[in-house]
Structure formats: C-alpha cells, structure tokens
C-alpha cells in the first residue's frame, strides 16, 4: 500500500452555521471557527458548505461556487482561516456539492428561460408523458423527482429538493465549469474536499420507469442509480483533471456503490482518498421512511463494523464516523438506556477512533452531545425532517408517532448549536440562535468538561494522542483490525496488529463485569 500524507491524520467536521457565532446574528461564522482552532487540536477540518446559497438545504444548494455566503463572513476571513490553520499544521477541506446546484444559480435561471437552449443542457429537462412526469422516480427527500416548468411541457430532474436541480455530467461544458471551479479552490490552498452525493452523477438517460415500491405509485430514485453503469469513468476524469494534480485529500459520500467497486473507489489509485463507512447508518433505514426505521444494537454494530473493516483491509482506508450533520447523534442512536452516560459515550468513541482508517469526529461528539426533542414539527428547520414527517402522516401514523420518528432520526439533532458553556444560548451566540439550543446544555458543555479531567472531552484527547504517539502511530495507522471474542455477548473487542506490534481494544457494553482470557486468544 502506498503511504500518503493524510495517513494517520484525525479529522473534525465543523457545521459552521452551528459552531460559533461572533457577531450576534444567531448564525455561526468563519470568525468563530478561527477563534477555536486551538481548541480542536486535530489535523484536518472539514467545513460543511459555506458557499453562497439560499439555504433551502442548509447550503447544499449552491447559487455561486466562487463566493462565501455573507452569513458566514468574507473571502478575506476564509483566507485568514487557511493561513491560521497552516500555522498549526492543520488542513482545511471543503464540502464539494457537484451533483446539483441551487435553482437560484445563474445557470439554472438561464435554463428556465430556454429549456431547449445551451443552459437547458446544463441540466436534465425532459417533456412529460401524457400530462405526467417523465418517469415515476421519488426523490431522496420525498415526492416526485421531476418538477414541472410552469407554462411549458418540460420537467427538470432533482434527486433531492426541487430547489436542487441535477447538473448534466454528460455535457463537457458543465464538466469544464466544475473542474475550473475545483482547481480555483485548490489553488487558493484548500487541501481537499468531502464530496457530496457523488455516486448520483451518472444517470440512465432513458429514465425508465420501475415497479412502484410505495402507495404513492413511485419508486425510490436510487433504483435508477443502482441500475446504471459507467460512473467510474466520470469519477476518474474528475480526479485526473483536479485532485490528482494537487495530491488533494478527498473523502466521498457514497451510498449506492456496487460491491465489486471498492478498490476502484479507494484503492491505491482509486477515485478518492477514502470514503465514509455508512454501514451502521444504513442498518437503520426503514422500508418506507423514518417512521419504520430500525433500531441498531451493539451486536449489529459489531457485525457491520468488522465486515466493513475486513472488506477494506487490503484495499484502502475508510473514514470512520459515529455521527455527522446528516444523522442523529450517535450517543442517542446506538447506546442502550443503561449506557446513556459518559462511560457509554467513551466506549463508543473508543470503538470508532481506534479502528483502522481516518477518524472523523463531528462537532459536539467530543463532549457527548445528544439528540434534541423539538415540541412541534414547526420547530424543525431541516427540509428532510419536514418531508419525512409528512410521509409518516400520509402512511397513517399519528402525530405522536410521526414526531417520535423525527426525535430519533432528524438531521437537526446534529445541527443544534454547539454547547460551549452554561450561559444563555450555551455560549453559542449573544443573539437568537437560528435553531433551538438543546436544553441539556447546562449539564453538557465544553467549559464544564475542560474543568474535569475524567470528562468525555479529555478522553477523546487521550484517544487521539495515543493514535498519534511515536510508540503506537504505526500500528494504529497501518495495523490490521483482528476481531476478538466475536461470539462473546457484551464484548466489542479487536486487536490492531502489525508484524512487530499488537494492541488490544476491549470494551464491555453489558450491564455486568466480564472476564476474558487474553492468553488463549488468537
């Protein structure tokens, strides 16, 4: 395996809108990130989108790829962030959203005026069939994936929200626009990108109908993605025109990859440096939506994590996560009631951070932030939460049942403001926060944990220091994961092993003390 500059690094995801507000407008900003660089003490910072956007989907609907949205600050402040990070040997990676853009982007506004013209071919405009959409796809956010252009026979494709039209990756002009933009950011000093929803860029241009999978008569658009070949050619072209030139670090968000494509994606010469391991998250998916989402226990977690590690051990590195901006808090999702405490959170952190791969820690994870129960669906900001609530109600759920699904699965669970201290609004802002602060901030906050050496925050610091220590960095970076005591109830254990060194990671997630025999284990 080729050794890369990013091997052995630890990453931290910042959701800027909820990280730290420094001007009192209730929205986190770049100055807040700069002010806390020394707090982090990690190597790579992934910034969720800060581009100009109408924020229908919290910045994943970009209206100008070359501008910082004014709610976050200025390009000068971004340049300052790059410079300050460099002083600390830290790397900044940005979110790259190139499957789609905002319907407010100049390209799409021009396309609406002439769907059959030049800019119409930047997107997927198709005429309807007998007064219906071109095909029966349900978008990832619910409802038809086709939106009718008022006053015409045309519809446009949007795999996500209707305000996020899909870009046409079959158009060389679109590719040139995107490659130029990516290289502009890399020239500026960005170290790489987290690449959003990238598997979706390849479409079956015949847009065939599929057998409906729900009472709405539609089928999930993932069916089309799974049925089409050739995405690898697009991804390789993307890499060669951009990332490869800069030795950039790239981490892909991939859900629909085919089983035999792992090496192609993250091998030594793969399309990307790494990709997130979503195997635990995928186990929670319901057949019809959040309202029938599945519970995942530690026995399930053990199986899928070990399976993912085994598949990857001779191929490349995974990006290991417990939570991110698109998922509920890991402590709330994975820990049983009896482990809803700091010991349980430390256990979960140990399992994840010490695995082979790149640990990605999401803001607030290092202090054990939890899900936040909102009183009403109106209190949620997330577009997918509102859509899933409607899906649950349409399926016959009561308001209470639909709200319970949101409590457990909403993306807003991870987007509540960072809890810095026990002052008003958790020290996040002096104004009114854009999203509710979790009421538990009095008990769970950074200031309290920095004053207590047995806290979750200090424990995460110790895990990171151990991974990066001179004595152990080789085994924790390149050592294989060897599952241990797999059949023993209540134990989640594995070894990190090289030819010269073995380290045991053993956790007990039961209610009882358990004895294991290390002398007889293989």
List each language-model region with its residue ranges:
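Residue-level marker for buried hydrophobic side chains located in beta-strands
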Residues: 92, 193, 362-363, 505
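Beta-strand-rich binding/interaction modules
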Residues: 513-522
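Loop/helix patches that line or flank the sugar-binding groove of alpha-linked glycan CAZymes
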Residues: 4-7, 210-215, 220-223, 233-245, ...
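Acidic/aromatic-lined carbohydrate-recognition and catalytic surfaces
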Residues: 2-183, 187, 200-260, 267, ...
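Hydrophobic residues within beta-strands of alpha/beta enzymes
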Residues: 45, 193-195
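Short, polar loop/linker segments at the starts of domains and inter-domain junctions
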Residues: 20-34, 291, 335-340, 428-434
